[in-house]
Amino acid sequence: MNLLSDDQKYAVHHGDCIPHMLEEMPPASVDFSVFSPPFPSLFSYTSKAEDIGNSENMKGEAKIHLSYFFRGLARVLKPGRAVVVHVMQIPRLKRSGEVGLHDYRGLNIRLGERAGLVYEYDWVVRKNPQAQAIRTRSRELQFAGLESDRAKQRGCLPDYLIKFRAPGENEVAIDSDGDVSRNEWIDWAECCWSDIRETNTLNVKEARSEEDTKHICPLQLDVIDRLVRLYSNPGEVVFSPFTGIGSEGYVSLQQGRRFYGCELKPEYHAQALKNLAKAERTHQANSRTLFDAPEAVA
């Protein structure tokens, strides 16, 4: 059973991804998955109990949610295929005891492995420390802390791209011509991606008016583009269980892939469908050959 019909380019389920993956989606139906999970206690997207972002206890509620999540993800991923999880470490506030960091990266790795996925690698995505200091107002990055007491100073928080692989043999090799050149791979094989443009997001690219719903912390399009080209073939299904406004689908469709997503928040779901429709129109327009064009008028 397939996620999408033969002529269907994309679809987004409106609802909680966890029961949808565990009970409703066909098993082994996803060719590649890339997403940014909600960050517990850091960003709250909805008031719903199903929203992982509303979990206050990293070792309690968030861990339970994510353990079921990874079980569902392992169920729908095809054998031998990859999933990349975009995370960052989460600042621990005074109400949690000492100021420091929650190891969100490690939590995702442990729960992914426990669900049966094979942890293979993670890339680091460089962040601008000055921009992060201004945006987060973190004393640990600011000059005030540097010049008063350096005991608690730390560097900025990078992003991590955690790569898992479903156990088993991959039946269809990912070997499409022209997707990734040798020169690109020389750059992308670096352990730290320092050339990702932080502002190249769907918020900036497509949110043209106040009526357009913007995501709180969207994943950069450069990251998605690289991963989609690396780990999927044209025509295959890319899955994002936390679709947001559709960043992963937007890039996937423009790269000739198909997309399936889940989104809990109504406003994000509606905006995602708009963005995906535009991406598909753009891809179709760019795919037209000279022979498809209307004949010139003499």
Question: Which residue ranges define each predicted feature?
Answer:
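Core catalytic lobe of class I
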Residues: 1-271, 298
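Class I S-adenosyl-L-methionine-dependent methyltransferase module
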Residues: 107-108, 271-298
